[in-house]
From Swiss-Prot:
<protein>
    <recommendedName>
        <fullName>Putative phosphoenolpyruvate carboxykinase [GTP]</fullName>
        <ecNumber>4.1.1.32</ecNumber>
    </recommendedName>
</protein>
<keyword id="KW-0547">Nucleotide-binding</keyword>
<comment type="similarity">
    <text>Belongs to the phosphoenolpyruvate carboxykinase [GTP] family.</text>
</comment>
<keyword id="KW-0210">Decarboxylase</keyword>
<keyword id="KW-0342">GTP-binding</keyword>
<keyword id="KW-0456">Lyase</keyword>
<keyword id="KW-0479">Metal-binding</keyword>
<keyword id="KW-0464">Manganese</keyword>
<dbReference type="GO" id="GO:0005525">
    <property type="term" value="F:GTP binding"/>
</dbReference>
<comment type="subunit">
    <text>Monomer.</text>
</comment>
<dbReference type="GO" id="GO:0046872">
    <property type="term" value="F:metal ion binding"/>
</dbReference>
<dbReference type="GO" id="GO:0004613">
    <property type="term" value="F:phosphoenolpyruvate carboxykinase (GTP) activity"/>
</dbReference>
<comment type="function">
    <text>Catalyzes the conversion of oxaloacetate (OAA) to phosphoenolpyruvate (PEP), the rate-limiting step in the metabolic pathway that produces glucose from lactate and other precursors derived from the citric acid cycle.</text>
</comment>
Length: 10
């Protein structure tokens, strides 16, 4: 996922 829930891209 993009930046939104943790701050990193997965």
């Amino acid at each position: 996922y993009p930046d939104g829930f943790d701050g990193e891209a997965v």
